[in-house]
């Protein structure tokens, strides 16, 4: 692998046979025998879009998600917990299957939230905190700022509604 760093623009050019990839140097991560840059914008909703993640539960969700990230060794780059859904911008290793990551986060978070707040089960008849679906979108260097602005805008939009 031939590497050339262009310090003027802070880009790294990686020549892999005939293909040339240009990636911002600060977004590259290194593993044993591989270089990667994998970020995802993840979104999932509460069951029935019930607005239950309020009154401090949003802060608890953030803390629990940070602990899960440390335990499972992925990075949360940005996070917004809305009353009825969660936005995450995550950076993970190529070995992670995104569907497994989401299952881990949703399952562990629901289990912990129901243990700490059993009253949630009454608000969400059926005993499920999350809708079974989710959205996972890859994020590039170019789209990262748009995703971050969108996530911040969601919080501002919610404040204006109330």
Q: Can you say where each PLM-predicted feature lies in the sequence?
A:
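Basic nucleic-acid-binding interfaces
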Residues: 2-162
